């Protein structure tokens, strides 16, 4: 029987070896695109498979999140021996009423998807965001059909306000929000 443990990571725990068994793989067939103000599901096919460069960049990003007061949650199975998921929450409030905190990443290793791990991570991020004074989560999310299905399932909707810096960085991402109650 597998044991699953959720915990916050410290900056010192975020290192490349943490991701040695993590498989960020996605076979994308369809993506959402905005055309004339409407979201349309289009046939856009590609495979994403993170390699050493993506993981090095990720380590730098996650360390920065922690250094700037944000939080990185991790999910381990088998008593902490294997990372199967993580999520990061930034610490800078933004929006016209400083209502948003950014969920900057949430990923589940390929073989561990569909087990509720992502939903539990999302819930932990929400609890933390409330503690940090946010009224809403902001997510600049991959436009793939599967990714958007996850966010819809947890209750996310199109963001009322768009963070233009995030839109410019990833113009095909869907800008989402989640109300924290």
Task: Map each language-model feature to its residues.
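Conserved GNAT acetyl-CoA-binding A-motif
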Residues: 129-142
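Conserved acetyl-CoA-binding loop-helix of GNAT-fold acetyltransferases
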Residues: 105-108, 114-127, 152-153
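Basic/polar N-terminal segments that are highly enriched at the extreme N-terminus
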Residues: 1-4
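Structural motif
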Residues: 132, 153-154
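Short glycine/proline-centered loop/turn elements that form peptide/ligand docking sites
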Residues: 118, 122, 144-147, 164-170
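Conserved catalytic-core motifs of GNAT/GCN5-like acyltransferases
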Residues: 138, 157-174
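Acetyl-CoA-dependent GNAT
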Residues: 14, 21-99, 104, 109-110, ...
């Amino acid at each position: 029987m597998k044991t699953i443990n959720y915990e916050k990571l410290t900056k010192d725990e975020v290192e490349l070896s943490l991701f040695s068994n993590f498989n960020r793989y996605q076979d994308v067939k369809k993506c959402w695109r905005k055309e004339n103000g409407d979201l349309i599901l289009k046939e856009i096919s590609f495979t994403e498979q993170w390699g050493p460069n993506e993981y090095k960049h990720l380590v730098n990003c996650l360390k920065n999140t922690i250094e700037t007061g944000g939080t990185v949650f991790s999910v381990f199975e088998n008593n902490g021996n294997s990372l199967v998921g993580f999520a990061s929450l930034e610490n800078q409030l933004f929006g016209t009423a400083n209502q948003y905190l950014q969920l900057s990443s949430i990923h589940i290793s390929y073989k561990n998807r569909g087990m509720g791990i992502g939903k539990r991570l999302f819930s932990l991020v929400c609890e933390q965001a409330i503690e940090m004074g946010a009224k809403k989560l902001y997510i600049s999310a991959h436009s793939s059909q599967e990714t958007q299905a996850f966010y819809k399932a947890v209750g996310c909707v199109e963001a009322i306000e768009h963070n233009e810096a995030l839109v410019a960085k990833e113009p095909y991402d869907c800008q989402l929000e989640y109300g924290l109650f």
